[in-house]
Amino acid sequence: MTIKIGINGFGRIGRMVFRAAIANFKDIEVVAINDLLEPDYLAYMLKYDSVHGRFDGEVSVDGNTLVVNGKKIRLTAVKDPAELKWGEVGADVVVESTGIFLTKEGAQKHIDAGAKKVIMSAPSKDDTPMFVYGVNHGTYKGEAIISNASCTTNCLAPVAKVLNDKWGIKRGLMTTVHAATATQKTVDGPSNKDWRGGRGILENIIPSSTGAAKAVGVVIPQLNKKLTGMSFRVPTSDVSVVDLTVELEKAASYDEICAEMKAQSQGALKGVLGYTEDKVVATDFRGDARTSIFDAEAGIALDGTFIKVVSWYDNEWGYSNKVLEMARVVAK
């Protein structure tokens, strides 16, 4: 069965979802894209990417149609999702990647326009069910509108799950050292809500807030109110790393923790959690479709119950691949 996807918002994640569908998901077909940019410019942005390189395929525009490798994709430039007529293209799932419609009320407009299901490519701003593929996707019960959480939650949740399932997490703090995103400015500029966020990313390490750790408590209810975290935005274009420091309920050696991470990466969490003992750095994970790659050489332990684990993630490519894994789940 071919799953037909619509994409609302052709920014970083929208374009990476499209590329991932072409590269890794032969059962998924993108049938429509909605974005306010001109068709020629959308094609250009798809063809050329400063982080992930040139698109491997043929891209052209015919009026309001994007033609990719001979397949026609409807293009629209509509502000109100209720007017998108997803039913006309048979969209099974709409990926909501504008960052705007992050409530059930907003996403419902896609359903009203004919979409069967909606996946928000960001944490929801209400009680919309949140899923991390590999961690709690098995609890999906047919909801029409879901959130795929954040890229950082997709990295943190698998390692937190392994630790909690085996030894129990009493409490923990997370820091993500996060590549720059579209919210960063190249030079200092106005940012009313987040003054630090308005400083130029080329010259700075910028402390920032993140709800990623608290969101793990939604995805893994046993960890509710046990984790919180913060972020440092750094002058890199892609690939981020989670540093999770926890107090365990039961004692474990660091070697035992590494062994369990390795076992899970080859077992139940294969394709989601990775494991490495190599002397790696950020760019080594660019283009990695897994959302959390445990770095055995980077973590440390103070004693049996106080440990720090480190896990890498391509915050664009890995996350976008898991959006499509969730699309498979909700389309069944």
From Swiss-Prot:
Pathway: Carbohydrate degradation; glycolysis; pyruvate from D-glyceraldehyde 3-phosphate: step 1/5. It is found in: Cytoplasm. D-glyceraldehyde 3-phosphate binds at residues 150-152, 181, 210-211, 233. It catalyses: D-glyceraldehyde 3-phosphate + phosphate + NAD(+) = (2R)-3-phospho-glyceroyl phosphate + NADH + H(+). It is an enzyme of class 1 (oxidoreductase). Pfam families: Gp_dh_C, Gp_dh_N. GO terms for molecular function: glyceraldehyde-3-phosphate dehydrogenase (NAD+) (phosphorylating) activity; NAD binding; NADP binding. Gene3D superfamilies: Dihydrodipicolinate Reductase, domain 2, NAD(P)-binding Rossmann-like Domain. Its EC number is 1.2.1.12. The record marks 178 as: Activates thiol group during catalysis. Keywords: Cytoplasm, Glycolysis, NAD, Nucleotide-binding, Oxidoreductase. One of its GO terms (cellular component) is cytoplasm. The active site is at residue 151. SMART domains: Gp_dh_N. PROSITE patterns: GAPDH. NAD(+) binds at residues 12-13, 35, 79, 121, 315. It comes from the Bacteria. GO terms for biological process: glucose metabolic process; glycolytic process. The keyword Protein transport does not apply. Homotetramer. Belongs to the glyceraldehyde-3-phosphate dehydrogenase family. Catalyzes the oxidative phosphorylation of glyceraldehyde 3-phosphate (G3P) to 1,3-bisphosphoglycerate (BPG) using the cofactor NAD. The first reaction step involves the formation of a hemiacetal intermediate between G3P and a cysteine residue, and this hemiacetal intermediate is then oxidized to a thioester, with concomitant reduction of NAD to NADH. The reduced NADH is then exchanged with the second NAD, and the thioester is attacked by a nucleophilic inorganic phosphate to produce BPG. This is Glyceraldehyde-3-phosphate dehydrogenase. The gene is gapA.
